[in-house]
Amino acid sequence: MDAGLNISGTNAEVMPGQWEFQIGPVGAPAIGDQIWIARWLLYRIAEDYNISATLTPKPVKGDWNGAGMHTNFSTKQMREDGGYDAIVAGCEALGKNAEFHVQNYGAGIEDRLTGDHETQRFDTFSYGVSDRGASIRIPCLLYTSPSPRDY
C-alpha cells in the first residue's frame, strides 16, 4: 500500500506479538501528520484482517519491555559543530519540567516506565550517552564523532 508515508524501518520487539515501525526522517509538522495517518492505517489494516492492534503501554503484563512511542529529534544547533553542548542544554531544559511532560504521555505509563527493561521510571528524569535506561538516550556515535554531521 502506498500511503505516502516515510516508513524507514520495522523490527520485532521483546513482548510477544510486539512490533515497531519507524517513520522518518521527516520534518515538522509533517511528522505529526504521518504518525496520525500511520496509526489510523494500523487500526484499519488490523480490522481488515480481524486482528487487534493497540497502543496500550503494556497490554500483556509480565517481565518484559512495554511499548511506547519514542522519537529522535534535533535542532539546527544540535547538528552543527559543538552540537553536543546544545543537546545537553536541551536535555537540561526538558528535565526542569519533566513531571509536567510525563503527565501528557497517556494512561498506563507507570506500567511501562518502571525503571526496568531499558526504561527510566516515570517519576525520574535522566539523560546519558548510550544509556538505554535513561529518559533521553544520546547516541554513542553522536558523542564520539568529530562532528554531529558525521553521525
Specify the residue positions occupied by each region the protein language model found.
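Short, ordered beta-strand-loop transition motifs
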Residues: A12-M15, I138-L142
